[in-house]
Amino acid sequence: SLLIAPMVVPIVVVAVSTYIFFARIGLNDTYLGLVLVHAALGAPFVLTTVLATLQSFNDNLVRASLSLGANPLMTFFRITLPIIAPGVISGALFAFATSFDEVVVTLFIAGPTQVTLPRQMFTGIRENINPTIAAVATLLIIFTTTLMLALEWLRGRRR
């Protein structure tokens, strides 16, 4: 339950508490701090999807592979990974979307030298009206729509 806390706790609470903690250990205004907080916010999504995929995983496949002479590394790459890949990919996509959406945490943790695309868009919307922001937003919508259509197409091919 501790691992899914970032999903449940309001983002402002996470941002302020992370800011206070990182200020004490010197990670504010650093790329390392920014990466750590975004990893912590994305980890619950990866964990829940991968664990859900692993619950339906049949351990007999690994035993059969090992009994037929495959080494553990080959078993992982040829048996386990292809089966859990959809869970890993969906978790990674959720983590990316969450990280991309977290402007609040970035505003608290990042210094003036750490500029992310969401932060730049937020600043652009607030401070100056610029058609670049509309163009980037349009590209993001096209990217998301294309990604969703590709996933649906791949799902249809598996059936």
Which residues does each PLM region occupy?
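Residue-level signature of the transmembrane alpha-helical core
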Residues: 1, 5-8, 35-39, 80, ...
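Hydrophobic/aromatic residues in alpha-helical transmembrane segments
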Residues: 1, 14-18, 32, 46, ...
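A structural signal for multi-pass alpha-helical bundles of membrane permease subunits
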Residues: 15-25, 93-98, 126, 151-152
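C-terminal transmembrane helix and the adjacent membrane-cytosol boundary/short C-terminal tail
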Residues: 51-66, 70-81, 134-159
